[in-house]
Structure formats: C-alpha cells, structure tokens
C-alpha cells in the first residue's frame, strides 16, 4: 500500500538519482630501473639512476671483472677496469647514501674509528667476493676505495708465473720479497705461492696482514690468518709473537720500517720461510731500499744479514696486452753465491749484470721479460717501452732482433 494518505502518489517532485561514483584510475608509478649484474652496461648505467645498495655495486664490478670501486660524497661512482678509470653515468653520491653504504660493510665501532682518525683500512666478505676497504676524508668529503679480492685463489700455473717461484716456495727457510707498485698484482702472486705450499707441503702457515686479503682454507698445511685491528692490536706485537707460535711459513705483508725488516730477517735466520712485500719497481731497487732503512754505521751488519737470509726478490709489473687484457712481467733476483758477495760489498750494479746472464738460475731482468712478450706477440713494442725502467736498453734489444 502507498505510504501517503488516500493511497496517492508522493506530492514531492521526484529527485533524479545521481550516477554511482566511479573512482578515476590512479596514475601509474614511475618506472625505476631494476639493476642486476646482467642488466648493468659495462661502462655506464642509465643516467639518473644507480644501484640501491653497495652490494649491488660490488656485484657489478665482480661480474664485469673490474678490480676496484671508487665511491665518494659529491662524486660520480667509478670503477677501475683493466687499469683504466671508468665512469658509470650514475648520479653523484650524497652524504646519506654514503653513510648507508658504510653501514653495509662496517660496524658502528669501525665507523667511529674512521670518523675519529679520518682514515680506515679493513676488509669485508660478501657472499660472492671479498673486498679490501680503504676510507679517507678529502676536500670534497668522505670517500672509499674497494679492492676486489677473488674467493678462488689462482694457482702458479693458472697465472703462468715463472717456475722459479715454485722453487722458492719449496725452500725450508729464508726471506722472499715480492715487490712492485700498487695494483701490480703482488698479493695475487703471493697468494699463489702460499696456495702451492698449502697444497703440496705439510706446514704451519701464519699470515699477519693489515687487512687480510686472500683467505686460504687449510689443506696439506695448517693456515692461520691474523688481521691487525681484529686479531691483534699492534702489528709488531703479532710479528714478534709469531716466532713463539711454531710456524714454518710467515707472511707479513708489507715491510714498512726497520723494525719489521729486522724481525723478518730474524725469523728467516731461525728456521722460518718468510714472505714480505715492498713498493719497489725492481729487484736491485728492493735491495737498495732495505739497506737504506739502516744508518751508515750499521751498513756492514745489515748487508751481512741480508746476504745470509735473502732467497730471492720478485719485482712484478702489469702490462696491457694486445687483446686488451693485462699480464705480469717480472724482474727476478735469486741470491746465488755471487749475488751474496756483491751484497756484502754493496756492489748492487753488478747484481743486475748477473741477473741478465743467469737464466739457468731462474733470474731475469724486467727488460728480458718485456722483450719476450713483444717477441711472442702478446704486447706492442710501444707498450713494453712505456713500462721499462731502461727503455733505451730495451729499444736496442728489440732493434737487434729485427
């Protein structure tokens, strides 16, 4: 029945029904490039975007075969690829992003140490690669350099290193120096020599590093790594203590001062095989450097100690090859009886002459190594001459072969 009197219709005019409200579609979110190692271009990323995490940045470097990552506040991220600095095309890094990256690889205490000292050396292990960390402060702001350290240690054979390096590694005691400029692959060569001992000899190998770089799993040998700052407070304390820890082989990293050298020589003279590095470009320059750590009044004593303890010096450099890659070349001194006599007398010029004509002892000069690379077609003469410490001598040798 009608709700109105008399059953009539409503006296009010009908109100038209409003159409139902249909919400307008929301605009699609802007597309943000998703970075993966596979999608990242080799030299530059999509302008205006970049990987979100430090791990992604390092993974791209790892998968592309780059050696270093350079990051800094107010700077465009860059890689080092085959010796050359490479731009990424990503935006400059702001302070908040840089701080977030630090928290990915450092503890609060380590960050506080960097903020206090303005410098920091350390290491971090991702699931796919290990990195050596160096932090610095600069005019533009804080910055970091990450050196990628492969988890798999290349063998002496895989690196095509001279056979004499295996012979040196097999010696029971003495001092072996692997030298070269920064980025020349000293750590890789040392790791290969330690790996050979670990694979073939029953030894106790102790490394004292700042920081630990290549990590060796114990095989035939027992390997223990100690990192300055984490496992020992002071490098020299750890090195001195090592003599009481029953090692057969001691890797001490860089010989930076007289105290380190003295302990290394003492260890090598008391039945240990000791490996160390210096930033020198040739075998003879290495001898000059270590003798130069001592004053004139102590020269006779240090020359005698070095002549008795030194097994050999391997000075390494890296050279760009014809296929765009890089290979190592070596200046190798084996401390034969003749070399010992020259070291005792301080006649270092004669040592290089012996190196050039003692290939049967495993010795060679850097120029001989460079000449062979040119003759084998692995590099150009111009690139070899650019690396040579004695380019006129090398040029004459190259002319003599044509």
Outline where the language-model segments fall:
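Short, flexible helix-loop junctions that flank or precede catalytic/ligand sites
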Residues: 4-5, 11-13, 19-402
